[in-house]
Structure formats: structure tokens, C-alpha cells
């Protein structure tokens, strides 16, 4: 192929050394001379690979604690010289400069350092790479002659072409250059976001860049006629679905991912064993228990009909006892997300006659790291950004506003209901009993309609339950409906012009009411 450029000299300077020794060994076997610096050179030499020292080649030592290594004309001229221009080639020959045909660079882990708990400003600043981005941009600019690899994932493609073609093609070099510029753009954006956030004292930055990398193409979107793909956000260090390990099951769909994310978000909000059951991005069941199997039993009983074909989230390792419960006749589950799965549980879930290996099992790892701190949502012409709606209030900050007191036995259910209602589409109403969800009214334009739907779902179980509302009650009509259903206590933000009427209606029916002072709309 006429566009194949042979690789005779390679410059390697990387922070992430995953797969590097094997890659460099392949380059050496292909007759490539390798130049390298500092820790990268030491790593390669320890792996038995011959390496030329950049400091010896440039005649200038590394200095300033490694801040200056490759910033030298002998390096950059060798990268930027155009092979099709005689004066370029004559110039580097006059100065005894070797042309580099391959540059392998990945950058200091700035984003990882910034997201690490306890990282100091000095540590973050020290992870701002200078020479690396310069090398990457130089090689990417001259991609007509130079291949630039910025990720271990690219090593295989480069070696394949060296082995089969003796060099790199224009198509590969162009692709690598595009990925390189995307890499440095995201890197600089992360630094700017950090510096802007620091400068304005925690306000949202004046500009924001969303840097995402496509992980996989999905079969389709919410509907078969819509194209879809999944992109990863390297700045999200919490346990998440994009970096999760799929243990078994069919390919995840767009809707599966949305529902699994909602299921995980609910489960991680509880300290005790918790299970959430999601259908169309709303919970149709949820519960806590002394054990995971108790929690899943209670959660699935919340709305058994809707739970068919649902996805489930858990905040504990899925054990065999829980798996045995899920394998009972009549249950069908699309997917399960959990920190981990016992081997016996996987065996049960993947050999159930009706399921076989179709159920998708997603292992996300420990839930120690908090979930994302901000939420982002695209609208026409821009993006909305807000703090994530995390629960920071506690019963100590709440206020019982009725003369009717809250029975001590109801506080666990009240706290559970208040945690759950923020996960339901507004107008949102939930009924809870025995720390389990027994009725959900979601997404209605009228609050009283949501109340009536939740009561209908709970049926006779509503007797002795508590009701949680994501926003205030504009009229007492919802209280009348709750009283007929046997609700004993209601928790809501308060703030209506008719709060007095609502409170009076509660006292009339001997229902306790708690104000939290915090609304939890979800649109």
C-alpha cells in the first residue's frame, strides 16, 4: 500500500504502563529502535527490552524533578519534520536528528488525582502534564508521517499493521490523530474545570466541556427506530454501570441501562440491606431488611404484577438464599445490578430453565464512593446542570406540625418513604409499610391523582401505612383520600398557602403530619 509509513524509530513516554512491555517487545521484534525517558525507560529495561535514553540522545539531562524531559528540538524536530519536504529532511539530517515514525504517550493521571479523596492542591497541580500533551499534539499534527498512540487499547492495531504491512496506514494514523486531539482536549478541559472551580469558590464553572468516549453501540434506543450508543465518563469514579462487569446475560439495551441506573441509585441510598425493583425508570417495589433475602421478598411483594420483567438493584452481594427466592416460579427479571455475586447465586440465576443465561447480571463493585455530585441534562440549545438531589436532612431537622403526634413505631417507615419519594417522577406519592414500598403514584399532573393511584396499588395494605409526598399539598383533598385508606402519618415538604387547611384535615382524621422543608421534584 502506497500510504504505508515504515516504523524505524519510536518514542515512548507513558504514565499508564499497562501492556507496555509486550507492545515494546513487539516493536523491537519488528526492528524498531525505541527511545524513552525516566520511569518508562526503567520499566522497559527491567522487561529486557533495549532502549535508547532520551537524555543521552538530546545531550540534555532530565531536570526540575522530571518536569523537563522531552522538551527539546531534537525530539520535536524528529516528530514534526515532513518526509515529503526535502528541506525538512535536509535540516534534520544536518543536525543529526532521527525522524520518529511512532510516538507512544499517555498523560499524567490528572483526573484520577483530582477525584481522589484527600488529594491536595499541590498534588493535583503536579499531575498537570506539559511535555506529554506537546508530544501528542506534535505527532497528531504530523500524522501524515507519524503514528500517535495514546492508549494501551491502540497497541494491538499498531502491532497488527507492523506485522502484516511493515508500517502504519494513513487510515490508522488519521484515526489515531483524531483520538489524540480528543484526548488532549479532554485533558485540558479537566484542568480548566478544576482551576475554574477552585477560583470561583465552588460555583459552576463559566464554561463546561463534557468529554465522553463511546464504549459500545447499542442495538437501538428507547424504540427500535432510534439509534443509540453508550458513552463513558472517565471523571465518574463512583460504582457505575458503564464500568461494571457483565457476568452473564444478553446484550444490555438502552432501556435496561436507564432502569439499572435508577435501581442502583435507590439501593445505594440505604445503609441496611436494600433492594429496589424498577419498571420504566420508576420504582414499583423497594424495601430494606435484616438480610438481603428478606429485603428482596418484601420488595417483590410491593407490586408483584408490575415486577414481572423488571430490573433489580441491591446494595449487598447477591447470595444463594436471595438467588433461590428470585428463581421461584412465576418471576421473570430482565437484569440485576449488585456490588458482587456469589458463585452459587450466579449458577442458580443462569441455569433457571426459563431464564437460562438470559438474565443480565451486572457487578459494579463496592458502593463506598458517593454517586455523582451533579446531574446533567441536555435541552435544545444547551445543557442544564444542577447539584444531584441527595438526602442530607434527617428526622432531627423535621417538624411535626399536627397536634396528632407521630407514633414511635412509624418513624422507620416515615424515613424510608421520604428517601423513596425522591426517586419517583413528579407528582410523586409513595405509601410505605414495614420499610417497604406498597403503593406508588408517579408522574401525574394532579397530586390527588397520584395519591389515589398509590392507594389503589396498595389496596387493603394501606391500612396503617405512611404516605410521602415529594411536594406540598395544594388542597386538603389528598388528606381525605389518605384518611379513607387508613394512612397513619404523612411526610411532605410543606410550603403551601393552604398548609393550615391541610394540617387541620390531618388532625380531624388523627393523621400525624411531618414537614421537612425540602422539596424533591423529579422531572
UniProtKB/Swiss-Prot annotation:
It holds the Pfam family AICARFT_IMPCHas. Its EC number is 2.1.2.3, 3.5.4.10. Keywords: Hydrolase, Multifunctional enzyme, Purine biosynthesis, Transferase. Residues 1-150 form the MGS-like domain. Gene3D superfamilies: 3.40.140.20, Methylglyoxal synthase-like domain (3.40.50.1380). One of its GO terms (molecular function) is IMP cyclohydrolase activity. GO terms for biological process: 'de novo' IMP biosynthetic process. Pathway: Purine metabolism; IMP biosynthesis via de novo pathway; 5-formamido-1-(5-phospho-D-ribosyl)imidazole-4-carboxamide from 5-amino-1-(5-phospho-D-ribosyl)imidazole-4-carboxamide (10-formyl THF route): step 1/1; Purine metabolism; IMP biosynthesis via de novo pathway; IMP from 5-formamido-1-(5-phospho-D-ribosyl)imidazole-4-carboxamide: step 1/1. Belongs to the PurH family. It comes from Rhodopirellula baltica (strain DSM 10527 / NCIMB 13988 / SH1). Coiled coil: none annotated. InterPro entries: AICAR_Tfase_dup_dom_sf, Cytidine_deaminase-like, MGS-like_dom, MGS-like_dom_sf, PurH-like. Signal peptide: none annotated. This is Bifunctional purine biosynthesis protein PurH. It catalyses: (6R)-10-formyltetrahydrofolate + 5-amino-1-(5-phospho-beta-D-ribosyl)imidazole-4-carboxamide = 5-formamido-1-(5-phospho-D-ribosyl)imidazole-4-carboxamide + (6S)-5,6,7,8-tetrahydrofolate; IMP + H2O = 5-formamido-1-(5-phospho-D-ribosyl)imidazole-4-carboxamide. The IMP cyclohydrolase activity resides in the N-terminal region. One of its GO terms (cellular component) is cytosol.
Amino acid at each position: 500500500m502506497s500510504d504505508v509509513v515504515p516504523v524505524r524509530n519510536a518514542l515512548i513516554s507513558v504514565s499508564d504502563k499497562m501492556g507496555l512491555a509486550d507492545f515494546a517487545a513487539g516493536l523491537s521484534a519488528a526492528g524498531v529502535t525505541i527511545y524513552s525517558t525516566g520511569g518508562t525507560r526503567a520499566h522497559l529495561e527491567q522487561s529486557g527490552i533495549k532502549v535508547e535514553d532520551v537524555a543521552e540522545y538530546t545531550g540534555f539531562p532530565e531536570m526540575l524533578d522530571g518536569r523537563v524531559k522531552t522538551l527539546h528540538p531534537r525530539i520535536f524536530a524528529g516528530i514534526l519534520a515532513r518526509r515529503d519536504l526535502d528541506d525538512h529532511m535536509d535540516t534534520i539530517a544536518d543536525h543529526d536528528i532521527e525522524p520518529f515514525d511512532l510516538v507512544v504517550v499517555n498523560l499524567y493521571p490528572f483526573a484520577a488525582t483530582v477525584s481522589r479523596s484527600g488529594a491536595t492542591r499541590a498534588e493535583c497541580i503536579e499531575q498537570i502534564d506539559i511535555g506529554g500533551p506537546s508530544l501528542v499534539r506534535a505527532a497528531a499534527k504530523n500524522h501524515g508521517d507519524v503514528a500517535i498512540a495514546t492508549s494501551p487499547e491502540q497497541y494491538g492495531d499498531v502491532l497488527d499493521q507492523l506485522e502484516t504491512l511493515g508500517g502504519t496506514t494513513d487510515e490508522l494514523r488519521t484515526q489515531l490523530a483524531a483520538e489524540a486531539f480528543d484526548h488532549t482536549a479532554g485533558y485540558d478541559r479537566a484542568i480548566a474545570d478544576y482551576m475554574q472551580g477552585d477560583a470561583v469558590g465552588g460555583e459552576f464553572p463559566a464554561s463546561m466541556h463534557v468529554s465522553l468516549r463511546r464504549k459500545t453501540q447499542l442495538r437501538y434506543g428507547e424504540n427500535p427506530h432510534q439509534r443509540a450508543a453508550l458513552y463513558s465518563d472517565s471523571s465518574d469514579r463512583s460504582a457505575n454501570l458503564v464500568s461494571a462487569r457483565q457476568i452473564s446475560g444478553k446484550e444490555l439495551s438502552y432501556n435496561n441501562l436507564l432502569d439499572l441506573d435508577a435501581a442502583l441509585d435507590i439501593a445505594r441510598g440505604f445503609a441496611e440491606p436494600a433492594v429496589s425493583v424498577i419498571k420504566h425508570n420508576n420504582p414499583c417495589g423497594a424495601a430494606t431488611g435484616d438480610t438481603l433475602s428478606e429485603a428482596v421478598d418484601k420488595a417483590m411483594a410491593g407490586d408483584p404484577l408490575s415486577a414481572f420483567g423488571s430490573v433489580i438493584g441491591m446494595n449487598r452481594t447477591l447470595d444463594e438464599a436471595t438467588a433461590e427466592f428470585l428463581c421461584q416460579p412465576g418471576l421473570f427479571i430482565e437484569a440485576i445490578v449488585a456490588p458482587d455475586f456469589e458463585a452459587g447465586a450466579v449458577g442458580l440465576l443462569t441455569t433457571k430453565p426459563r431464564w437460562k443465561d438470559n438474565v443480565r447480571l451486572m457487578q459494579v463493585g463496592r458502593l463506598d464512593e458517593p454517586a455523582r455530585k451533579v446531574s446533567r441534562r441536555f435541552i435544545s440549545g444547551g445543557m442544564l446542570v444542577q447539584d444531584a438531589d441527595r438526602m442530607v436532612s434527617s428526622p432531627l431537622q423535621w417538624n411535626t406540625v399536627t397536634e396528632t403526634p407521630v407514633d414511635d413505631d412509624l418513624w422507620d417507615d416515615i424515613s424510608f418513604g421520604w428517601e423513596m419519594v425522591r426517586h419517583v417522577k413528579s407528582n410523586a406519592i409513595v405509601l410505605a409499610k414495614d420499610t417497604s414500598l406498597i403503593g406508588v403514584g408517579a408522574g401525574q399532573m394532579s397530586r390527588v391523582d397520584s395519591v389515589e393511584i398509590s392507594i389503589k396499588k396498595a389496596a387493603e395494605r394501606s391500612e396503617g401505612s405512611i404516605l410521602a409526598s415529594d411536594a406540598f399539598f395544594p388542597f386538603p383533598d389528598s388528606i381525605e383520600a389518605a384518611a379513607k385508606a387508613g394512612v397513619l402519618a404523612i411526610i411532605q415538604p410543606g410550603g403551601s398557602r393552604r398548609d393550615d387547611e391541610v394540617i387541620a384535615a390531618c388532625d380531624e382524621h388523627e393523621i400525624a403530619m411531618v414537614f421537612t422543608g425540602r422539596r424533591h421534584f423529579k422531572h
